[in-house]
Amino acid sequence: MGKMLKISILVIVLAFIIVAGVYVHTNYQPTETALAYLNGTRDVNVTNVTTGLFLDGPGNDTALIFYPGAKVEYTAYLPMFTQIASEGVDCYLVDMPINFAFLGVDKADSIINESNYSHYFMCGHSLGGVMAGEYVNHSSNVDGLILICSYLEKPVNVPVLSVYGSEDTVLNMNNYNKSKSMIVNNFTEYIVAGGNHAHWGDYGEQSKDSPSHITAEDQQKQGADEIIRFIKQWP
């Protein structure tokens, strides 16, 4: 191997290491509070599955499939979705390739194909919501869509719940308002007063977000209650 070729390979390897290091450094990791939920609760059993985590609560009729936000570890969302599972809606938290949902848009396919629920709802936070909407656009197996501080890029023909915080300065409101015209079925909007972008998960503060005026626990409780209310109104 020539000297110049060796140098070129070394430069490429070093560049990859630097890029990987920067990515890992800017990735949003779950807090200890979130990770404690890996042990489950009295009402919810948490298990590892091929697509991520399965939160098995007392219900057996309805499942919620969740796509996380960009660069956020899916385990960071355990607290809120454990609340939802405890109310009778089993939840799948999907582990996306390098934490970008656009690299795993169709991951819901295997969940739906390998389970036996009567009803499926898609849900996503931020970029995960955009990709959940993308999935719903070409799937006939979904009963509804929940967008958490997110918006649509393609039309959907199922009921939609949109939830976001009043202090969210990450959500692109121009895109959000434009996307409302893509909802051709029932649309429900719920704004959490004082809530921000990051506190739907437990991963700390997020770049370009504004401080929340309420606790993460309060924000997640309001969101979980509204999601349960939305799902249970559709027989």
Features from the language model and the residues they span:
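Gly/Ala-rich beta-loop-alpha elbow adjacent to hydrolase catalytic centers
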Residues: C123-A132
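Conserved alpha/beta-hydrolase
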Residues: F81-A101
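Catalytic histidine neighborhood in serine/cysteine hydrolases
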Residues: I183-K208
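Short alpha-helix in the alpha/beta-hydrolase fold that links the catalytic acid
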Residues: M80, L171-M182
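A conserved short beta-strand
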Residues: N141-Y151, P159
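N-terminal Sec-pathway targeting helices
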Residues: M1-I17
